[in-house]
A protein has these predicted regions:
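Compact, glycine-rich, soluble single-domain proteins
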Residues: 2-63
Length: 63
């Protein structure tokens, strides 16, 4: 399985939000993330970048 870490981009810094994310879905209120442990989070954000080689997703707050 290919899980990713989700980071928030803010003021030039990346902050780790979630680990072991296997599902990302676009919803009306933003992005929904689900981990392999069943934890779910929704962020009012958009994807800034995705690195498959680093298993990393960077999001930023919606303007």
């Amino acid at each position: 399985m290919c899980e990713v870490k989700v980071f928030k981009q803010e003021d030039g810094q990346e902050t780790l939000l979630l680990k072991d994310v296997y599902l990302i879905e676009q919803e009306d209120e933003g992005l929904r993330f689900e981990t392999i442990f069943g934890e779910q989070k929704v962020y009012k954000a958009e994807i800034e970048s995705v690195s498959l080689t680093d298993n990393k997703v960077v999001i930023k707050e919606k303007a």
